[in-house]
Amino acid sequence: VALFKPDPDRSIEDIVEDLGREIADRFRDAEDEAIAEVAARARRDMELAARLPEAAAGAGLTVAERREQNRILAELAATRARALADLARLGERLADGLRPADLAARLVALAALEGEAAAAASLGIGGRGLRPVPFTSTAGQAASMVAVSLENRLTNLRERITRYPRDAYQRIVAMYTPSTLLGITTSQVQQARIVQRFLAEGITGFVDRSGRRWTIGAYAEMAGRTSVARAYNDAGVWRMQQNGIQLGTISGGADACRKCAPWIGKILSFDGTTGDVVLPHATRDEPVTVHIDGTLAQARAAGWGHPNDRCKVNAYSPGLVIPQRDFEYDKQAEHERAEQRRLEREIRSAKRDLAAAMTDTDARRAARDVAKAQAEMRGFLKQTGRKRASYREQLHFADG
């Protein structure tokens, strides 16, 4: 049985970021390789198309030019047939390397073990001398449904990866029918830009329950981060309940969103209890009246624990100070976080345009866009004092 030593001192933010990034990287790398292979074949087609003879104004092709045209068109047809076969095999290979069932089970188990360890340490039943715990522990079992849900989502992404290389190339071939290649419709420069924009979009078409659209990298990251946070908190709550703790409080970042902010610092029950209750004081031999603001289920129903949320459920000790008890929603802080995410997407988008460029001119234009977006990010960080997360600006990161 695989062993893992959880660290109760790791923050949930770090755990969600690290494990979510692993999923995002895995699917983003597969997407990037697929796009690069399709782009290489599209560039080759363009180079062949550029060699097609063009008739002078008001005149037709000569016999020799007609033969050359037929030869190039035949070569295009042959290379396209080979490309379709190669790209079909590429899609299968990339999909085989993703292994969504193994990935989901491992990452959710890691998150659950971390959550249980953190809860145990906070209750004084853990400590720094934690022994390695097998994946078959109760924490992993408690998170099994979360793992199944994540596996189903990742399997859907895997199927899209399988089809994408061949489907994308066929879309590009449709853009380069013989009539367009012969200059009857769009110029070659315009055609190259159309292909570049299409490839830069990546694998799209993922829609969540709220109707929001995602790219494959963003969806993989969102699914991973959400499942990791849920497994972490569920395992922690399970450990608390096993030790007779039925109350908790939520902690979150200073830039928490409007859905989470109302619940940060509130006392919530795990068993449905609400209102005023009298409980033994955590450190003194006396009773204390505790006001329970709501239940964990109510918080989730109101939007807490939404996709990409990184809030944490902590055990509440009656009579002791509640961390973040007076927390207030900061609209400006949330706006700055959202703006940083937008700038990161702009940088990644420019880098994707650069990777998918069909011509040297387009590559130079995309490189200027990358530099411009990076300069805008530097100015924003200087103005707000926020920390830069350079890894989120890389192509292999998600778009969320």
For the regions a protein language model found, what residue spans apply to each?
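N-terminal leader/targeting and assembly helices and adjacent pre-domain segments
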Residues: 1-199, 319-320, 324-400
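The feature marks a conserved, polyanion-engaging helical scaffold used by nucleic-acid processing enzymes
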Residues: 191-212, 227
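Acidic, glycine-rich two-metal-ion catalytic cores of nucleic acid-processing enzymes
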Residues: 206, 214-318
